[in-house]
UniProtKB/Swiss-Prot annotation:
Induction: By Spo0A and PhoP, during nutrient starvation, especially phosphate starvation. Repressed by AbrB during normal growth when nutrients are plentiful, in association with the transcriptional repressor Abh. InterPro entries: RiPP_SkfA (IPR030919). Residues 1-29 form a propeptide. One of its GO terms (cellular component) is extracellular region. This is Sporulation killing factor. There is a cross-link at residues 33-41 (2-(S-cysteinyl)-methionine (Cys-Met)).
Length: 55
């Protein structure tokens, strides 16, 4: 999973240079929360992801 998180980080950094980059960062952060199954962090995430509801 660490490999996937690095890929998400690179995507979020590229997204910061474009309009709407904040939403990409949020999505990457929420996926990171979901991947780590950190319940406290998933509650902080603003995007309702279908996979999040399963937790």
């Amino acid at each position: 999973m660490k490999r996937n998180q690095k890929e998400w980080e690179s995507v979020s950094k590229k997204g910061l240079m474009k309009p709407g980059g904040t939403s990409i960062v949020k999505a990457a952060g929420c996926m990171g929360c979901w991947a780590s199954k950190s319940i406290a962090m998933t509650r902080v995430c603003a995007l309702p992801h279908p996979a999040m509801r399963a937790i």
